[in-house]
Amino acid sequence: MIRDIALAPSGKQKISWVKEHMPLLNILNEKYSKNQIFNGLNMVVTIHLEAKTAYLAQVLKNAGANVVVTGSNPLSTQDDVAAALADSGVIVFATHNCTDKEYDMYLSKALDVEPDLIIDDGGDLVNMLHGERKNLVAKLIGGSEETTTGVHRLKALSNNGKLAFPMIAVNDAYCKYLFDNRYGTGQSSWDGIMRTTNLSVAGKTVVVAGYGWCGKGVAMRAKGLGANVIVTEIDPIKGIEAVFDGFRVMPMQEAAKYGDFFVTVTGCKDVITKEHFAVMKDGAILSNAGHFDVEINIKHLEELTVEPSYDCLLYTSDAAD
């Protein structure tokens, strides 16, 4: 279930490009395509569906698995990549910008394969397996979870004695949080912001909400681009670390007055709400680099809107008067 199979050629080009820059995955592909380590196993892969993860899905298929792929976030699914995967024989349930209802339907349809193994990103698949599809748990060998948010959800289940099957916390691996979270998120976040806004970051004030590994990367790259960086952080130790790294640290209510760019990287809900919007500069840019689109309260922002447009929400506040 994809947007349009005619998009496959574009997706294949993207996958072909990343294959040239993923030597470790190429080595694994060569090794496991020969010994068919996953032969006969059903595998559901729920990930940010783009070229790199699509190549991972192809490698798993080449290793013998019957692979079913869904997107872990409707906004990150690339329809041409989904089409390329489907054209290569991978079962895909994913479309860009699908509704919440469609998203849940895709997860459920993927689980109809009755997986032996799962790969999750964010915890929605695991959550469904502990709820409406818990009948599938008996067959499940286990799986892995990629991201910080998903690992937090796993640990909550485990701490309450409710985790029903073994899961590998990939996010706790050194190579994940030291490199992907910090350097990958830092670079890709600013790449997205600058491509979207076409604005210079140098000389601007950037507010980074959260100083975990992803937040560290976002703040580091903002500093490298010439920004004045403010960090908001509820953990006092991480807050001190941000100070030692050369950043100003303050509560969001205070930081909201100064920011030109805001990047939320906490994994928490309602990091920026109407009380913060009310004191922001006119023209402030808000962005979220966390897994779920819940860190900036869009409903509050829409309530303040006086002139909606495709590109932005304009509203009046005391700060703008």
PLM feature segments, named:
Residues 2-38, 72-76, 82-204:
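Glycine/serine-rich phosphate-binding loop and adjoining beta1-alpha1 elements at the start
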Residues 50, 187, 194-256, 264:
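Glycine-rich phosphate/diphosphate-binding loop of Rossmann-like nucleotide-binding domains
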Residues 66-75, 230-232:
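Short internal beta-strands
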Residues 47-53, 73-77, 123-125, 213-214:
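Gly/Ser/Thr-rich loops at beta-strand to alpha-helix junctions
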Residues 1-4, 315-320:
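Conserved small/polar residues in nucleotide/adenosyl-binding loops
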Residues 250-295:
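Rossmann-like NAD(P)-binding element
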Residues 50-63:
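Histidine-anchored nucleotide/phosphate-binding helix
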Residues 137-148, 278-314:
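ADP-ribose/adenylate-binding Rossmann-like module
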